[in-house]
């Protein structure tokens, strides 16, 4: 039962944690109403950060509903996502999604992110060759 909890060590806690994901993104999954950004870690720990702004939903109840659903879905998909820092970024239109629909989209997005994270990253090599 304890593997489904959401303690401090599986959360991105400060601005530096979030900034490292934004600066060194290794995988992205865009799912229309939300965006998942991931950065590979040196260890097997998986951490999640949530960004749900007032632009996505003016009411705190709606923002908290979105965060609750994302945390719940993340808890069930932690194992295939090991070794990643992940930022969930809510986009405009997410508040119109029903809970079941959002949960299904999150399930697909976690799977896509796990597949992308397993692939070796060649983007860095391409970016470096373009700069020369």
From Swiss-Prot:
Assembly behavior: Consists of a catalytic RNA component (M1 or rnpB) and a protein subunit.
Superkingdom, natural source: Bacteria
SUPFAM superfamilies per the UniProt record, alphabetical: Ribosomal protein S5 domain 2-like (SSF54211)
EC primary class: hydrolase
Catalyzed reactions: Endonucleolytic cleavage of RNA, removing 5'-extranucleotides from tRNA precursor
Recorded family membership: Belongs to the RnpA family.
Entry keyword set: Endonuclease, Hydrolase, Nuclease, RNA-binding, tRNA processing
NCBIfam families: rnpA
PROSITE patterns attached to this UniProt entry: RIBONUCLEASE_P
EC number, as in UniProt: 3.1.26.5
Biological source species: Marinomonas sp. (strain MWYL1)
Pfam families: Ribonuclease_P
MF-aspect GO terms: 3'-tRNA processing endoribonuclease activity; ribonuclease P activity; tRNA binding
Function, in words: RNaseP catalyzes the removal of the 5'-leader sequence from pre-tRNA to produce the mature 5'-terminus. It can also cleave other RNA substrates such as 4.5S RNA. The protein component plays an auxiliary but essential role in vivo by binding to the 5'-leader sequence and broadening the substrate specificity of the ribozyme.
UniProt GO BP: tRNA 5'-leader removal
The UniProt record lists the keyword Nuclease: yes
InterPro entries from the UniProt entry: Ribosomal_Su5_D2-typ_SF (IPR020568), Ribsml_uS5_D2-typ_fold_subgr (IPR014721), RNase_P (IPR000100), RNase_P_CS (IPR020539)
Transmembrane feature ranges: none
Record-given protein name: Ribonuclease P protein component
Gene Ontology annotations for the cellular component aspect, listed alphabetically: ribonuclease P complex
